[in-house]
Amino acid sequence: MPESRAMTLAILSALPEEQHGLAALLEDTQVVARAGRRFVRGHLHGQPLVLGLTGIGKVAAATTTTTLIEHLDVQQLVFTGVAGGIGAGVQVGDVVVAQAFLQHDMDVRPLFPRWQVPGYGAAAFACDPALVQRLQQAAQACTAQAATWQDPLL
């Protein structure tokens, strides 16, 4: 029977301040440079993990994510930081775990419905439910007063 291995998780941020201190928590670290980006690979509590900075903007995030998938065998992704905005009622320091991600900054009308991603037939894309659950549990365990945001459009 083949040995199962943990999926590699990447934690990405646009800015170094949004990842402050994470690299120091990793064990067995290795710095990897690919496609003009610097990644730190290691383990956190036994979980294979890659840390990376994308720079600002969704194109920078998309190209960094592509590099992670193609060259570093990443199967799961968590983005930390503001990620483009703060929803109503959310304060700096709050933990928000998204259930979906959205196309929000390109209006393709009249060719397609508003916000729809051409070729995909959708404006919202569901996150991995198992990863969402793990992140919610971790947030609740690590924060004194964790608020749970259920608004799928945050």
Where are these regions (language model features)?
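Short, conserved "active-site rim" segments that organize catalytic pockets and cofactor/ligand binding
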Residues: 7-26, 30, 48
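Glycine-aromatic micro-motifs
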Residues: 2-3, 65
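Glycine-rich phosphate- or other oxyanion-binding loops that anchor nucleotides, phosphorylated ligands
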Residues: 8-9, 33-154
